[in-house]
C-alpha cells in the first residue's frame, strides 16, 4: 500500500496541487496517502428501474468499477439493504439506489465514473445526485491524473456533470475539503433524511498504532477480533453489526460494518511519519458526541477534522434546525481546541458543516504532522 517519491517540487507547484508544504520531504522514502477520495452517486428509481436497483448487478460489474480506478475487491458482506466491499484501498457500498466509493492512496477514483454511469443505465435508473469530495492530500505530488490538481479534478467532473458546483471548506493551505455536487433532486420530494458523519484524524497515539502492523495479511478472524479488542475498536463496531476487516502487511487496517440500512467504515495508516485514520457512517442519531468520543478514544489523535452532512428530515438535521447541539461542537471535546469552522447550506435545510480541532496541549507547539493545519487561536463560523 506504500508509495515513494524523491521528486523535488517548488512551493508554487505544490500549492497549484492545493496541498500543504508541511508534508513535503524529499528524503522520506515511503509515504502512504491516507486521506480518501469519496464518490457518491444516487439514482432516481422510476417505473422502469429494476426492482432491486443497483443490487441486481453481480459482483463482476463492481469488480470492473473498482478495477478502473486501480484497486481490487478483497472481501464482501451483505444484508437485506447493503452490499459491502473492502478494497485493497478502502471501501465500496452498493445499495438499491446508490453507490458510495471511498478510495485512498493514489487511486484514480474519477476514472470510475463511466463504469458507474453504465451500471445506472443497465438498471434503467435516472441520475439524481452526485457528490465527490476529499480532504486536502497529504502528499499531493504523488497523485495520478486526473487527481494531480484541483483544476484537473474539476474539469473531469464538469465533463460528466456540467451543472455541478464546486466548494472548498476551510483554509486552502491547511486542513480543508474539496466538494463537488450535482443535484437533480425533484423537490419537494417524499423525504430527505440522509446523513453522513466523516472524521479524518492525524498524529495517532503510538500505543494504538503498534497494533496495526503485521508480517502477514489477515482477513476477518479471531486474530482481527483480538486487534479490535486490544484497540477498543469493538466499542465502535459492537456485536450488533455485521463486519469484515483486513489487517494489511506490513501495516494498515480496514473495516466495514453494516446493520440494516446503516454502515460504518474505518481505514488506518499507522506509520509514525504519516499516521492517519478515517471514519465514516450514515448512522442515525440526533447527537453524534457519543459516537465521536468512542472513535477519538480509539485513535487519540493530535488533531482531527469532522464533516457532517445533514438532510432536513434526518434526526440530526431536525436537531440542528431546532438550534440544538448535534455533538460536533467544542463543548463536547474539552481536550481539543476548535481552529476553524465552515457551514454551507446547499438547498433549503440541507447543510454541510466542517470543523478542525487540535489537541489543546499542541496548540502552542509547532505542528510538524503531515499535511498539518496551522496552530492558532480558536476560529468561528465563516
UniProtKB/Swiss-Prot annotation:
InterPro entries: AdoMetDC-like, S-AdoMet_decarboxylase_euk, S-AdoMet_deCO2ase_core, S-AdoMet_deCO2ase_CS. It is an enzyme of class 4 (lyase). Binds 1 pyruvoyl group covalently per subunit. GO terms for biological process: spermidine biosynthetic process; spermine biosynthetic process. The record marks 89-90 as: Cleavage (non-hydrolytic). Keywords: Autocatalytic cleavage, Decarboxylase, Lyase, Polyamine biosynthesis, Pyruvate, S-adenosyl-L-methionine, Schiff base, Spermidine biosynthesis, Zymogen. It holds the Pfam family SAM_decarbox. Is synthesized initially as an inactive proenzyme. Formation of the active enzyme involves a self-maturation process in which the active site pyruvoyl group is generated from an internal serine residue via an autocatalytic post-translational modification. Two non-identical subunits are generated from the proenzyme in this reaction, and the pyruvate is formed at the N-terminus of the alpha chain, which is derived from the carboxyl end of the proenzyme. GO terms for molecular function: adenosylmethionine decarboxylase activity. The active site is at residues 33, 36, 90, 104, 254, 267. One of its GO terms (cellular component) is cytosol. Pathway: Amine and polyamine biosynthesis; S-adenosylmethioninamine biosynthesis; S-adenosylmethioninamine from S-adenosyl-L-methionine: step 1/1. PANTHER family: S-ADENOSYLMETHIONINE DECARBOXYLASE (PTHR11570), S-ADENOSYLMETHIONINE DECARBOXYLASE PROENZYME (PTHR11570:SF0). Belongs to the eukaryotic AdoMetDC family. This is S-adenosylmethionine decarboxylase proenzyme. It comes from Leishmania donovani.
Amino acid at each position: 500500500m506504500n508509495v515513494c517519491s524523491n521528486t523535488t517540487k517548488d512551493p508554487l507547484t505544490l500549492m497549484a496541487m492545493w496541498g500543504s508544504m508541511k508534508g513535503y520531504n524529499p528524503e522520506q522514502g515511503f509515504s502512504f496517502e491516507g486521506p480518501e477520495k469519496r464518490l457518491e452517486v444516487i439514482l432516481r428509481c422510476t417505473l422502469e428501474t429494476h426492482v432491486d436497483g443497483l443490487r441486481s448487478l453481480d459482483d463482476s460489474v463492481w469488480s470492473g468499477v473498482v478495477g478502473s480506478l486501480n484497486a481490487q475487491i478483497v472481501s464482501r458482506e451483505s444484508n437485506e439493504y447493503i452490499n459491502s466491499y473492502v478494497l485493497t484501498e478502502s471501501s465500496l457500498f452498493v445499495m438499491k439506489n446508490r453507490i458510495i466509493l471511498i478510495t485512498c492512496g493514489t487511486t484514480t477514483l474519477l476514472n470510475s465514473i463511466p463504469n458507474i454511469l453504465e451500471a445506472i443505465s443497465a438498471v434503467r435508473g435516472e441520475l439524481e445526485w452526485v457528490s465527490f469530495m476529499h480532504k486536502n492530500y497529504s502528499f499531493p505530488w504523488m497523485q495520478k491524473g486526473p487527481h494531480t490538481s484541483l483544476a484537473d479534478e474539476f474539469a473531469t467532473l464538469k465533463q460528466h456533470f456540467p451543472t455541478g458546483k464546486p466548494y472548498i471548506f476551510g483554509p486552502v493551505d491547511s486542513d480543508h475539503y474539496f466538494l463537488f455536487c450535482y443535484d437533480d433532486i425533484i423537490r419537494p420530494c417524499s423525504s430527505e433524511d440522509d446523513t453522513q458523519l466523516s472524521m479524518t484524524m492525524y498524529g495517532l497515539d503510538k500505543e494504538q498504532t503498534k497494533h496495526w502492523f503485521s508480517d502477514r495479511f489477515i482477513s476477518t478472524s479471531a486474530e482481527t477480533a483480538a486487534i479490535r479488542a486490544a484497540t477498543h475498536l469493538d466499542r465502535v463496531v459492537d456485536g450488533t453489526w455485521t463486519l469484515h476487516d483486513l489487517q494489511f502487511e506490513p501495516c494498515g487496517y480496514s473495516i466495514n460494518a453494516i446493520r440494516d440500512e446503516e454502515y460504518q467504515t474505518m481505514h488506518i495508516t499507522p506509520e509514525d511519519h504519516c499516521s492517519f485514520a478515517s471514519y465514516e457512517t450514515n448512522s442515525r442519531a440526533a447527537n453524534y458526541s457519543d459516537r465521536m468520543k468512542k472513535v477519538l478514544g480509539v485513535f487519540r489523535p493530535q488533531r482531527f477534522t469532522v464533516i457532517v452532512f445533514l438532510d432536513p428530515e434526518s434526526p440530526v438535521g431536525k436537531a440542528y434546525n431546532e438550534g440544538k447541539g448535534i455533538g460536533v461542537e467544542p463543548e463536547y471535546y474539552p481536550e481539543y481546541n476548535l481552529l476553524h469552522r465552515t457551514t454551507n447550506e446547499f438547498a433549503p435545510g440541507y447543510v454541510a458543516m466542517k470543523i478542525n480541532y487540535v489537541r489543546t496541549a499542541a496548540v502552542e507547539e509547532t505542528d510538524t504532522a503531515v499535511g498539518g493545519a496551522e496552530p492558532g487561536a480558536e476560529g468561528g463560523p465563516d
